[in-house]
A protein has these predicted regions:
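Non-catalytic terminal segments and appended small domains
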Residues: 1-60, 74, 86-153
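Conserved interaction-surface patches within small, structured recognition/assembly domains
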Residues: 47-48, 63-69
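Small beta-strand-rich domains/subdomains or short beta-sheet motifs embedded
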Residues: 68, 74-77
């Protein structure tokens, strides 16, 4: 697992740096998507997350969910044109999961991409993700990631 300023980036995920999201390839043509550790730190304590409806088709750059914290309300944008085939019901009942487990229990939606070959070039992993987020954090003048009690990545 890579780490930048106490912000964790698991090696087995793909990232879209600008949207501050991760994608996990499920090996069946679907991807789970969620917010990065950096995004959950920027948002602060998340109090609500509402995903778009299952079955909805979303275009790259559009919102798949809205997240609300004490200091921020905003969209979670998808880097892939896709159909939302599932949403994480656990976070609908307890949005703090996005803070305590952004990469494990905190997936937001499951996507079935329709233009993966055309759009996957914007996703990064490994050293490219690390360098991309270093630049992102520097440009946004972000310090260290903050982890809640019980944080498990």
């Amino acid at each position: 697992m890579a780490e930048i300023n106490n912000c964790l980036l698991p090696d087995d995920l793909q990232y879209h740096v600008e949207y501050n999201v991760w994608l996990r390839d499920n090996g069946d043509g679907t991807f789970d998507m969620g917010m990065t550790d950096i995004a959950q730190t920027m948002a602060g304590a998340v109090i609500h997350c509402r995903a778009k409806a299952v079955g909805k088709n979303v275009k790259k750059g559009k919102s798949v969910a809205t997240v609300e914290s004490g200091k921020w309300v905003g969209p979670v944008k998808t880097p892939l044109t896709a159909e939302i085939i599932a949403s994480n019901q656990d976070i609908e009942g307890d949005a703090t999961i996005l803070n305590t487990s952004p990469y494990k229990q905190g997936w937001i939606v499951r996507l079935k991409p329709s233009l993966l070959e055309e759009e996957k070039g914007e996703l990064v992993s490994g050293e490219d993700a690390l360098e991309g987020f270093k630049t992102y954090m520097s440009e946004k003048e972000l310090g260290e990631c903050v982890h809640c009690e019980g944080f498990d990545g």
